[in-house]
Amino acid sequence: WFAGGKGLDGFRQEMLNDKRVRILTDFENSADVFPGVDVAGGICYFLWARDEPGLCKVVNFHNGERIESERPLNEFPIFIRHSKAIPIVRKIMAINAKENNHRYLNERVSSRKPFGLPTNYTPQHAGIPCWFTQRIGLKYAAKEDVSDNANLLDKWKLLIPPYPIAGQTDFSKPVGFYYEGNVRIAKPGECCTESWLVAYASNTKEEIVSFKSYLFTKIVRFLLLQAVVSQHVTRERFCFVPDLGTYSGRYTDAMLREQWGITDEEWEFIDSKISTVEEPSDE
């Protein structure tokens, strides 16, 4: 319930705004509580003190380390589980407010079914080139079945899967999200089914390649992780990732560390949470 879950929005807001939740203990790895049991997203328990409202003591257990902090649960619209991540997110959001006027990628990434085609749409023999599942690849969709309400069809597009970490339920281990093998660059005139989200669209391929290098950095994927507690990654999960507006050149973690003032200690934590992926290609 920290960040997602079907039908849990009301419950989450009630919990985050309840100052009587005084202690919240969080285990990323469910096996730390129930050995041999795999519970996706981990385990938490909390103390609700009816007559003693105040700040909440958040206790994180991460790779055998116990970390405590006191903080308001409703500082953000979702609950960031890691206390070590809070100052990093705060810092980057403050800089983004000055440099990019509070713009984040949750306003840029497409919603599900960007072209109105469901995952089970049947490939056609002719029509508009369409990216289906990774197994099927590039086939065709009938022109009359394709909608383009967001005016994406005639642009270059970076396609990303909505389930980039399928199979991973233990979030105490490093998370990858995106890499060369699970993203696609779609040309102008190509669409996709619900098997993809359009992460970014541009009039030039060069800007798409540049944006891909931004998405592949560990810092950006770390910011995404703060809003992800399941294998399903929707546009809303990008709420902490700054949208730089336009993209040029190749982005690196060293560049973003300097821009956002990430310390060595903060980088060590980021590096421990996000797995390394290969350098992004130009294709």
Where are these regions (language model features)?
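Conserved Class I SAM-dependent methyltransferase catalytic core
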Residues: 1-31, 45-46, 211
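Flexible loop/turn segments at secondary-structure boundaries
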Residues: 2-3, 166-169, 277
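C-terminal substrate-recognition regions of SAM-dependent nucleic acid methyltransferases
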Residues: 31-268
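Short, amphipathic C-terminal "tail helix"
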Residues: 265-283
